Amino acid sequence: MEFPDHSRHLLQCLSEQRHQGFLCDCTVLVGDAQFRAHRAVLASCSMYFHLFYKDQLDKRDIVHLNSDIVTAPAFALLLEFMYEGKLQFKDLPIEDVLAAASYLHMYDIVKVCKKKLKEKATTEADSTKKEEDASSCSDKVESLSDGSSHIAGDLPSDEDEGEDEKLNILPSKRDLAAEPGNMWMRLPSDSAGIPQAGGEAEPHATAAGKTVASPCSSTESLSQRSVTSVRDSADVDCVLDLSVKSSLSGVENLNSSYFSSQDVLRSNLVQVKVEKEASCDESDVGTNDYDMEHSTVKESVSTNNRVQYEPAHLAPLREDSVLRELDREDKASDDEMMTPESERVQVEGGMESSLLPYVSNILSPAGQIFMCPLCNKVFPSPHILQIHLSTHFREQDGIRSKPAADVNVPTCSLCGKTFSCMYTLKRHERTHSGEKPYTCTQCGKSFQYSHNLSRHAVVHTREKPHACKWCERRFTQSGDLYRHIRKFHCELVNSLSVKSEALSLPTVRDWTLEDSSQELWK
């Protein structure tokens, strides 16, 4: 018959006996603090106490712990854990508990403390990263919204035209995701409208009998749509997208006139580029009128905004593409189309880095550039971009590794040096003050650290715990033993190591030790 609560009841009784001082057979001293406890409990929970009591059980009533490593509050917490099975850190630093548990060889507590320190560091790093991301997102959204409203107000508009007569050029993000094949749209070149490729009519084209809306009104409607799209994609702006964008299949096989939409830098306005192929059926319809509208849109949008909102690192690309475009317009006929490479450079040069995931997938892979989303620098390959991004992350990790100003870090008041916990600070302060709190009761000699006092105490007890393996001579200090071995047994040790390496037998070392010791006694 088992009693499941027996162990809990036993611990409770032992804890009450400890608080009452009943049957406590040892005293643990940590600095000036004294703790009464039971040897059996201490030896069961700590390997340090187990080894301490193993050899001389009757002569170890008082146990001195190194107060430079184990603090009194930390040992009190560990003593409560031994008797109650509960670990409550309260306001005690985790570093002090970790140092005390390591000193007492309480490995379960060491694991818990290391885990808590790791979680604490991860939490601080995540909170710092969220604050930086939130501030960067808000700054980008404000700058984009201000730029969009400013340019939209400067563009000419036709207020007399109705909303139903304006060309809705850009499809929504939902339409782009649902119908990737309709990413390129046709623009009607006459008042009656032209049937679209594949037998589908354009949903936003004007009906028969109505005139096409002017480029100014079309551009105005596009600017209004761009402002709302930037506000909707504020969260997407913070995402780090390093994937290589691929072009849509079938762009090269378009057999009808088309245009491509492009967001102008930061303002997210659309610059309409219209080209027509050399088709005999469509080459004679409204050519002169349409070319005039096309040139008006191009001059009003590109020349006014290209210089004002162009980043410094994209200026060479932009100027180069503009020169090539002007030469192409002077030499090319009406039936020529823009090459995919120049179109990609133009679109990516005028595109905000956060909008590249939405637009660059419709461009050809030739002549790709890779932009850093943090500093907007351009790189020729994704591998170089990854190397560049690692420098940003190293800088951020270095900033996060610095302790915050509001955190209570143990700091020396004299030299300003910081420490991980209080016991190392107290140990360091003795180097400034010259304090020697540990005094020998036999001769009155003082020491700065407790381990020096323990080593000195052996002189008065005349114990010789350090024995030589070769001649059985014993010494008080370990240093005396090492000097003795170097002086008398150095050649013997070297010869033994050479023999053991040459023979490589598992028992050759023990055999040689016995033989040599017999030779020494002759």
Swiss-Prot record:
It is found in: Nucleus. The keyword Phosphoprotein applies. There is a cross-link at residue 273 (Glycyl lysine isopeptide (Lys-Gly) (interchain with G-Cter in SUMO2)). Residues 121-143 have a biased composition (Basic and acidic residues). InterPro entries: BTB/POZ_dom, SKP1/BTB/POZ_sf, Znf_C2H2_sf, Znf_C2H2_type. It comes from the Eukaryota. The modification Phosphoserine is found at residues 157, 516-517. Lymphoid tissues, testis, heart, brain, skeletal muscle, and pancreas and, at much lower level, other tissues. Residues 121-164, 190-221 are annotated as: Disordered. A zinc finger (C2H2-type) spans 370-392, 410-432, 438-460, 466-489. Belongs to the krueppel C2H2-type zinc-finger protein family. ZBTB18 subfamily. Interacts with DNMT3A. Transcriptional repressor that plays a role in various developmental processes such as myogenesis and brain development. Plays a key role in myogenesis by directly repressing the expression of ID2 and ID3, 2 inhibitors of skeletal myogenesis. Also involved in controlling cell division of progenitor cells and regulating the survival of postmitotic cortical neurons. Specifically binds the consensus DNA sequence 5'-[AC]ACATCTG[GT][AC]-3' which contains the E box core, and acts by recruiting chromatin remodeling multiprotein complexes. This is Zinc finger and BTB domain-containing protein 18. It comes from Homo sapiens. The gene is ZBTB18.
